[in-house]
């Protein structure tokens, strides 16, 4: 197959360089977007009378036929086509003849590929937003069922304060909501049409860029043709936002991996979301969260690749930009599969060990802050109360005791304001219940937030 640009050259391209230069192996993923882009372009050329009505209809029908052939599995883009754009153009010419050669009037592959990527990415972002919302709903269902389930809260991976398990789960819903908002913001910058910018300087052909933008569902057009063909910010923003999402999924995964260990034993995995060992018959491995955690680095790598790709590249379009597609293709596939896997894991792959969770908050000093708050309620300055409780913790550790094992007389040795009601305040359930500041882990606050999220997520 002759290259579209071959008449400029005396000799054929080296076979290895031909393969090295080609992008058809991966940009064929854009075939439907490229067909839609070309149909919109043909309609516009007809509207502006660059094409006659019969030529316009012939080209559109030809492109629609190619789409049908592809969807029916009768047409598969491949070498020797250099890229998806020329592949479709060549196919169109073979179907309708010389008229097909008029399709590329007033555009370049530079603005064409930018349009295709944006159409593809816009659709992916819409799907990802739905997947994240489904994951939020899974977290919310677990939270709703565990408002009164207690779990140790950690700072520095040390026991800190007892929490409602629902409060802990709601924290992930908040993170995921920020991810959804970021994707929506990225979509807004994706949804700008570069079509009609041509190679870099626009075109003298009579075109209507606003018409093609409207046909393809874009909100507006690029106002600078150079920027239109050279902008890859939106690719970087998409992968950057995806990297942040993956950091959240990795955080969730790490906690699940810890929770299902014998050392924590806060939860267990069901058979639907765990695997075994080829050697050790007792093993039940958390492969799903481990894979999600591992795939996070993959997305981080794509972000670094894109940032490096655009670094120091002069205006306007450069062949470097061929390297933008595989990172965004793989990122979209990776995050979609990870979100789906995590949703399945939460829905049917994890069971909390309620008794172990309850026991865990009964046998530590995570109620130490509440002991200090008790003294504060007796008009003792907080810093004084803090120091008193520090002394009590040290006293208990030396004797291998907990607060609940002390007698009231022992408490009074440290401060006279202690009374019998201190034991009520120290019960983990009451500790959690009392933290009713807005956004806190108190049951009333958690119930309120569960209801708020039910409204937001329409469940």
From Swiss-Prot:
Major location category of this protein = cytoplasm
InterPro entries from the UniProt entry: Arg_succ_lyase_C (IPR029419), Argininosuccinate_lyase (IPR009049), Fumarase/histidase_N (IPR024083), Fumarate_lyase_CS (IPR020557), Fumarate_lyase_fam (IPR000362), Fumarate_lyase_N (IPR022761), L-Aspartase-like (IPR008948)
Write out the pathway annotation from the protein's UniProt entry.
Amino-acid biosynthesis; L-arginine biosynthesis; L-arginine from L-ornithine and carbamoyl phosphate: step 3/3
Q: What class of enzyme is it?
A: lyase
Give GO terms for biological process. arginine biosynthetic process via ornithine; L-arginine biosynthetic process
Query: In terms of domain of life, where is this protein from?
Result: Bacteria
| CDD domains associated with the record | Argininosuccinate_lyase
Where located?
Cytoplasm
* Alphabetical UniProt keywords: Amino-acid biosynthesis, Arginine biosynthesis, Cytoplasm, Lyase
State any GO CC term. cytosol
> What is this protein identified as?
Argininosuccinate lyase
Species of origin: Prochlorococcus marinus (strain MIT 9301)
Provide the gene name from the record.
argH
